Amino acid sequence: MERRDCDAIVLFGATGDLCYRKIFPALYHLARRSLLTVPVIGVARAGTDLRGLIARVQASIGEFVKGADAAVTSRLTELLRYVDGDYNDRATFVALRKTLADAQRPLHYLAIPPSVFATVAEHLSGTGSVAGARIVVEKPFGRDLASADRKSVV
């Protein structure tokens, strides 16, 4: 079987606590080992911009990575892109599709509330952003068996 690595990472909830405490430090460690070479696209409804995301990533690394190397942090921040918008607004996903450019195998990481999983998945599908993609769900998958079953249909 042919190995097909992702060619972009999309972080939904990029300005949230999970990304700040766990995901950004993990990305730093991948970059340190030269294992992260693809664009990392943050998506959030924070009213910020790329500069704001870069500042947040730098603060996260400063707080959670002991002895961080500024050159590695710089390499990581050079990979960053940002899409600001509402998860309920199709325009956010149109902007994401444009930011993904030629990416054929993006990894969509959902570090967002479970209540918007289905909406995000539907918008990704409706804008052509899921063909060849993978979706990682970070949160509990539903509140109970019935809601988990509904989400698995999406």
Predicted stretch roles:
Residues 23-25, 54, 120-124, 149:
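Short amphipathic alpha-helical segments
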Residues 32-81:
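Glycine-rich phosphate-binding loop and adjoining beta1-alpha1-beta2 segment
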Residues 153-154:
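Conserved small/polar residues in nucleotide/adenosyl-binding loops
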Residues 6-7, 34-39, 77-79, 105, ...:
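Short glycine-/polar-rich loops that comprise or flank the Walker A/P-loop
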Residues 86:
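Conserved acidic residues
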Residues 1-52, 97-98:
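N-terminal low-complexity, Ser/Thr- and acidic-residue-enriched intrinsically disordered segments
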Residues 90-94, 98-134, 141-145:
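Beta-loop-alpha module in the N-terminal Rossmann-like domain of NAD(P)-dependent dehydrogenases
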